[in-house]
Design a protein with these regions (language model features):
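Membrane-interface helix-loop-helix junctions at boundaries between adjacent transmembrane segments
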Residues: 62-132
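Long hydrophobic alpha-helical segments that form multi-pass transmembrane helix bundles
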Residues: 102-184
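Loop-to-transmembrane alpha-helix initiation sites
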Residues: 99, 103, 226-233, 256, ...
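Hydrophobic, membrane-inserted alpha-helices
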Residues: 7-14, 38, 57-65, 81-85, ...
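N-terminal signal-anchor module of multipass membrane proteins
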Residues: 1-35, 39-42
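Structural signature of hydrophobic alpha-helical transmembrane segments
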Residues: 21-33, 71-80, 166, 170-180, ...
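C-terminal ends of transmembrane helices
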Residues: 36-48, 85-96, 185-194, 240-249
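Cytosolic-side transmembrane-helix boundaries in multi-pass membrane proteins
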Residues: 1, 272-306
């Protein structure tokens, strides 16, 4: 898990640079809360040796923070940490036993329970000014505009949503949405260290690209293009760091590919037809529930057996 923390450093640094001290506070509260809660639950409730040294609680804290707006109140962040660690992870017995990604369970709980705070997006404004200006995410802009009868292409042009902004960090949203380059650099590091395999991520991104291309070619006024869908929202963070969590993803390559295809398809269906502009978190959690079945269908053959 230490490698995952290292891989997340570019995203953390970029988020703090662009969202300022407010994001630093969210990160600090989230990480400290997750680590402290795991330590206390393990020692005093489970009566077991501390597991904080495996870095998994720190990873959950960082990922939870990157899934939240920079202006999220500290007490809301703490509640998210309680749900992520106390409910989604330790209730199942700790690392290796949980069915669902803890950080995403925390995020979805907060999204449902505190929608006002969870949709109070800020525009990147530097180290001291990030919490001053509110704005919509690119997906939110498109979703709201389409409901008013505008075309997707016009909305992208009118709001100056460029691919370079999405790549190099200059868009509103959760901290983890701020820069595609930062996320991808961490993903490449994990691949180089052989911490993860690329199949799940590639199947997610490939499905989103292929399916969105079909819809976009059918009606470019109502559906956004593949590149826009790949670079916006939490797709890259989710596909590179959360869908690839070895505890909550399939063990086999075939199972992982089906897992990724499901995530990509569900994400796009929620984006295009759902009430929420973003569907990555819901898609990953839904597919997390299929992992036991996928592992049963596509179990790895044991060495020495036919």
């Amino acid at each position: 898990m230490r490698d995952v923390v290292i891989a997340l450093i570019p995203a953390v640094v970029v988020s703090v640079v662009f969202y300022g001290l407010a994001e630093l506070l969210v990160l600090a509260v989230s990480v400290i809360s997750c680590v402290a809660l795991e330590y206390l639950i393990t020692k005093y409730l489970l009566k077991a040796p501390s597991t904080v040294g495996d870095w998994s609680a720190a990873v959950t804290g960082i990922l939870l923070a990157l899934n939240l707006p920079a202006t999220t109140p500290w007490w809301v962040v703490f509640i998210g940490a309680v749900v992520a660690i106390g409910v989604a992870k330790m209730t199942f017995g700790g690392l290796g036993q949980n069915v669902f990604n803890p950080a995403l369970v925390g995020r979805v709980f907060l999204l449902i329970s505190f929608p006002t705070y969870m949709t109070n997006w800020t525009i990147p404004g530097g180290l001291f000014g990030a919490d001053a200006i509110s704005g919509a995410t690119p997906l939110g802009i498109i979703n709201e505009g389409l409901m008013k009868g505008a075309s997707a292409a016009d909305l992208i042009a009118q709001n100056g949503l460029t691919y370079s902004q999405m790549l190099f960090a200059n868009i509103g949203g959760s901290a983890g949405e701020v820069s595609a380059i930062a996320i991808l650099s961490g993903f490449i590091y994990l691949l180089a260290r052989k911490v993860i395999k690329p199949w799940i991520t590639l199947s997610i991104l490939g499905t989103v690209a292929a399916v969105s291309c079909v819809f976009w070619l059918a009606d470019p006024t109502q559906f956004t293009d593949p590149v826009f869908n790949l670079l916006t929202g939490g797709l890259l963070l989710g596909s590179c760091f959360m869908a690839t969590d070895y505890v909550t993803s399939p063990m086999s390559t075939k199972g992982g590919i089906i897992f990724g295809i499901g995530i990509g398809f569900i994400t796009l269906m929620i984006r295009y037809f759902g009430s929420y502009p973003e569907g990555v978190s819901f898609a990953i959690l839904i597919m997390n529930s299929t992992v036991p079945l996928l592992n049963k269908w596509f179990h790895q053959k044991k060495y020495g057996r036919a």
